[in-house]
């Protein structure tokens, strides 16, 4: 697991921890696996927030790509990209590539992740511009000059519950036979401070710009003391999930202070999405027979 950690002077770095069962992370080195290295993530305001935030990792072939939010305390937060060879990651030789910015200057852009496979021969990248989730396709991962992330909106707050202010992806989509399972966070202005909760959607396998199912009620919301309180209260904020056996493990930040895990049967979530959308699939037929 890659996770964001913050020092006493509010510098964000990325730590590493591993687990044999998905619950207990006893293997947790004291040194970070990734630290700020470039001017766009250096601390420009003493004591202010800066560094590398909210990493999302995607394995494609023998390479692990990491998209994260780079912030120096003055400029708008932007999406940065770095990568590492799978063998180096496994052996913890942190030979990360030099990071590059991939989102446009002077525009706040966050919550980005790569799909775990190319779509029609192109890299597919989800990111958040403004208050909505965008999808962009690119031929390669070379950015700069006049080439920046853009794309089109695929999900926006107007399609959520009435009090939703903004939303962003929780982590890379998970491929299922029914579609790409996308977990995403929503920010509700019903409370102060605002509440971050998690919802789920299903994207078309061949054309993920098509949202084929969307469960607008939360699958995870702040309930415990450590989710309701902390550096920022009323927050559950995942950056990744994994399927282990028949279960979906969702790893999230609680109250911007601790890391938790929530689990549920993948089949139950998929069935609720499909039922919510009124879709008739092999999965729903099987459930009906039972």
Question: Which functions belong to the PLM regions below?
Answer:
Residues 2-48, 59-113, 117-165, 175-231, ...:
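Beta-rich carbohydrate-recognition and catalytic domains
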Residues 51-56, 110-115, 169-172, 237-240:
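Beta-propeller and closely related beta-sheet repeat lectin domains
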């Amino acid at each position: 697991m890659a996770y964001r950690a913050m020092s006493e002077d509010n510098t964000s770095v990325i730590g590493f921890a591993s687990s044999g069962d998905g619950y207990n992370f006893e293997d947790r080195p004291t040194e970070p696996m990734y630290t700020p290295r470039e001017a766009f993530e250096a601390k420009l305001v003493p004591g202010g927030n800066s560094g590398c935030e909210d990493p999302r990792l995607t394995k494609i072939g023998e390479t692990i790509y990491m998209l994260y939010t780079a912030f120096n305390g003055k400029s708008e937060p932007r999406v940065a990209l770095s990568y590492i060879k799978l063998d180096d990651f496994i052996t913890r030789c942190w030979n990360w590539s030099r990071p590059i910015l991939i989102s446009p200057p002077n525009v706040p852009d966050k919550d980005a992740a790569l799909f775990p496979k190319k779509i029609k021969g192109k890299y597919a990248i989800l990111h958040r511009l403004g208050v909505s989730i965008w999808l962009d396709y690119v031929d390669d991962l070379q950015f700069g000059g006049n080439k920046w992330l853009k794309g089109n909106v695929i999900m926006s707050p107007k399609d959520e519950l009435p009090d939703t202010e903004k939303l962003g992806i929780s982590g890379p989509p998970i491929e299922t036979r029914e579609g790409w399972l996308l977990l995403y966070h929503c920010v509700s202005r019903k409370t102060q401070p605002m509440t971050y909760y998690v919802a789920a959607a299903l994207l078309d396998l061949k054309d993920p710009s098509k949202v084929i199912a969307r469960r607008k009620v939360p699958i995870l919301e702040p309930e415990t003391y450590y989710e309701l309180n902390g550096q920022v209260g009323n927050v559950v904020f995942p950056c990744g999930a994994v399927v282990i056996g028949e279960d979906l493990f969702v790893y999230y930040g609680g109250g911007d202070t601790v890391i938790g895990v929530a689990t549920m049967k993948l089949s139950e979530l998929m069935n609720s999405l499909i039922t919510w959308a009124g879709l008739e699939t092999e999965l729903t037929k099987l459930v009906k027979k039972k």
